[in-house]
Design a protein with these regions (language model features):
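A polyanion-binding, active-site-adjacent surface
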Residues: 3-11, 15-186, 190-193, 198, ...
């Protein structure tokens, strides 16, 4: 199956594309995109998956199809220095664009992202940015990976347990096994369970409470994950992330 994803990731994840769970996943995603009129004409969610084109879409699914693999496309396999694991894409209008915790420019910061920026300000003294778009982090080597890559509008968790988790597990596993000295940032119990197999002797694993307002004061604030990440990267001959 010829999946439209960044070439280095395509090579490393090729076995996944032929597995039964992934075929079932593509069938499910196709069923979630019934017919309507959406710009741009002729664009496909996954061209080679033979899924429905955008001009026939009626269901509202986030992120837009061209951004489903955005985390991989912006951060090639050999360029990954940091992995941050999220859970679901944002499910509100205009928010999700394929990077966990990130929102498009001009969109108000969701509460978790506000708390992330507060911790960066406290940890590094950096000002809170005007945009919540974290593409810059991805371009500097941060894989901002949600466990589930699509979601129905206003229905958190609606695409869980359909196959995305197995696919993103495979991506994390191949990184952990074939690369060294990556920083894995695991906020909250969900991310920590997903990253439980990572070899702590090969990589730095930073775990804390989630930045959600429900848990941020229980260990997220003050975790200094951003400075600790950069210290580790520099100690291993890599350039730091410009958080």
């Amino acid at each position: 199956m010829n999946v439209q994803i960044e070439e280095s990731w395509k090579q490393h994840l090729a076995p996944e594309f032929e597995k039964d769970y992934f075929i079932r996943l593509t069938e499910f995603v196709r069923s979630e995109y019934p017919p309507a009129t959406i710009y741009p004409p002729g664009r496909f969610i996954f061209n080679a998956f033979n899924l429905c084109p955008f001009e026939y879409q009626t269901a509202t699914i986030y992120p837009p199809g061209r951004f489903i693999f955005n985390a991989f496309n912006l951060c090639p396999f050999d360029k990954v220095k940091v992995v941050i694991i999220g859970q679901d894409p944002y499910h509100g209008p205009g928010q999700a664009h394929g990077l966990c915790f990130s929102v498009n420019a001009g969109v108000p910061f969701p509460p978790s992202l506000q708390n992330i920026f507060k911790e960066i300000q406290s940890d590094l003294g950096a000002p809170i940015p005007t945009s919540g778009n974290l593409t810059r982090w991805a371009n500097h080597g941060a894989l901002l990976l949600n466990a589930t890559l699509t979601v129905r509008a206003h229905q958190a968790g609606s695409h869980q347990r359909r196959g995305w988790e197995e696919f993103t597990d495979a991506a994390i596993r191949v990184l952990a096994e074939q690369r060294e000295n990556i920083v894995f940032i695991l906020w909250g119990s969900y991310a920590q369970k997903k990253g439980a197999f990572i070899d702590r002797n090969k990589h730095l694993v930073l775990a804390s409470a989630h930045p959600s307002p429900l848990s941020a004061y229980n260990g997220f604030f003050g975790n200094k994950h951003f400075s600790r990440t950069n210290e580790y990267l520099q100690a291993h001959g890599q350039t730091p992330i410009e958080w």
